[in-house]
Curated annotation (Swiss-Prot):
Organism: Rattus norvegicus (Rat)
Location in the cell: Golgi apparatus membrane; Cell membrane
Name of protein: Sphingomyelin phosphodiesterase 3
EC category: hydrolase
Cofactor entry: Mg(2+)
Activity regulation information from UniProt: Inhibited by nSMase inhibitor GW4869. Binding of anionic phospholipids (APLs) such as phosphatidylserine (PS) and phosphatidic acid (PA) increases enzymatic activity.
Any Gene Ontology CC annotation: Golgi cis cisterna
Positions with a binding annotation for Mg(2+): 362
Function: Catalyzes the hydrolysis of sphingomyelin to form ceramide and phosphocholine. Ceramide mediates numerous cellular functions, such as apoptosis and growth arrest, and is capable of regulating these 2 cellular events independently. Also hydrolyzes sphingosylphosphocholine. Binds to anionic phospholipids (APLs) such as phosphatidylserine (PS) and phosphatidic acid (PA) that modulate enzymatic activity and subcellular location. Regulates the cell cycle by acting as a growth suppressor in confluent cells.
Lineage: Eukaryota, Metazoa, Chordata, Craniata, Vertebrata
Pathway listed: Lipid metabolism; sphingolipid metabolism
One annotated GO molecular function: metal ion binding
Family statement: Belongs to the neutral sphingomyelinase family.
Sequence ranges on the Cytoplasmic membrane side: 1-10, 32-64, 86-655
Membrane topology listed for this record: Lipid-anchor
Amino acid sequence: MVLYTTPFPNSCLSALHAVSWALIFPCYWLVDRLVASFIPTTYEKRQRADDPCYLQLFCTVLFTPVYLALLVAALPFAFLGFIFWSPLQSARRPYSYSRLEDKSPAGGAALLSEWKGTGAGKSFCFATANVCLLPDSLARLNNVFNTQARAKEIGQRIRNGAARPQIKIYIDSPTNTSISAASFSSLVSPQGSDGARAVPGSIKRTASVEYKGDGGRHPSDEAANGPASGEQADGSLEDSCIVRIGGEEGGRAQEADDPAPGSQARNGAGGTPKGQTPNHNQRDGDSGSLGSPSASRESLVKARAGQDSGGSGEPGSNSKLLYKTSVVKKAAARRRRHPDEAFDHEVSAFFPANLDFLCLQEVFDKRAAAKLKEQLHGYFEYILYDVGVYGCHGCCNFKCLNSGLFFASRYPVMDVAYHCYPNGCSFDALASKGALFLKVQVGSTPQDQRIVGYIACTHLHAPPEDSAIRCEQLDLLQDWLADFRKSTSSTSTANPEELVVFDVICGDLNFDNCSSDDKLEQQHSLFTRYKDPCRLGPGEEKPWAIGTLLDINGLYDEDVCTPDNLQKVLESEEGRREYLAFPTSKSPGAGQKGRKDLLKGNGRRIDYMLHAEEGLCPDWKAEVEEFSFITQLSGLTDHLPVAMRLMVSAGEEEA
């Protein structure tokens, strides 16, 4: 299948569209700014608390007539542009595909050659998040603002979180708690160049945006600094290190056994990555607040590159650190922190290391999507953005916004399909909400069979009273997915050209598994075909599952304005009741604060990550290895991202 790299089939239509949008944009921007000036966020209200009341009134009286005058002047040009823009949308393609070719060991071509489908299985990590990148006036309804700056910041945090090396540390002694269990996959144990020194007892902590792994290097950084000298082909991000720590000497770590050569992790140049938001000034002790892009100081260990590697220590140098992989017995290596669960689960201050696939919702603003794409291309080679339709299409209502879906992948994308839900109503009908279906290649067998997986990203109808509409959309989602798999599958069943190893659905479904008003969606047949790792049954959640929708009134409270603070708050029941959104009752009663004291559960979980156990290649299975709720985007969106790591292996292989 040919992937569309431009929204229009020829340059003539593209130029005409650019001219028409240039005529519309001033009017669009003025309306957005005018409305936004009357919708302050709680953060802005606190900033203005000490200002005299007359100052705000003076600014409003002064600038409102100016905006209105400019708006009236821009209206004729906007009308002229709309006359050309609207019919052009019938020729517009439903997405734009971008590839920034990466020839490094972490690039897509190199990743395909790593796994042949033989021997041990392979894990794939998926993440989904609603990032609320709407036009600023609409974003303020969710108590977030400055969409363009947030887009840069979100991309930067995701990139730096995913680019960390995947390190797992197991502590033998229950009394040795010197290493936080808050982020079991985000600890780095630096070793000397000889690879024979013990893991240091003291650890230097750092913010996630300060860490730049090789996979997280921005394209412009590589152009400025040049490639790192002496890079080896085996230093990919897929390398992981398992460090086993004993508790015989208190907080002192034991020396790792039997170093495995070639297990490396790379640390890029220090300092702040390119693309940092200009109005975010980093300060000591400030981790992830609105005044700093720092995302956390609790769970990530920063290696001192120049000290042990013998490098020059210059800011532009890319030093490499050797990580000694201890030989751990298979039973010990697979030991889980939660014996009562088949997989590890946590509230993490970071996106998972070695993130393979990212699905985002509510990336509605085109300029924000471009900034987000620029940041994420430093880690993800393949990106689909500006997904959706505009104008009038078929029997659908007029669409002012696209679907808001955004997809990024480290693996090559083979096929893509998009469908718009035709039954949207109310304000949701103005956006072309739908489903994006993707087929990705993750490897090839020695017999040249492609190893592939299917991913569906969606965003369902939002108004809480429209359960029937969401159920219809879930029906359409299943039908479209079945058609997509049928149209993109290999023709021969006896000798297939492809092996399907995973089938994942993720996105914001706008209903939870604890509200009595959402019973219709909770019992949908989708949950019989796809497994929800957080769910026991209709209306019944697993005890460790928490809500993913934050209470927007508390987004900028000091207790939750940094990833680390939000992580700590969500690990306590009192904190969850204070800062997560809970089901709203249609019956009259107490207010939000008083009602929460009577509620049970852990909040509204409306962001889902589902995987299929059936429909995969015979003798293959996909099992959840890790599941995490992520706080790294605190202060930037009103949702918690979620991530899932699937272990794919042949059925006959024993764990």
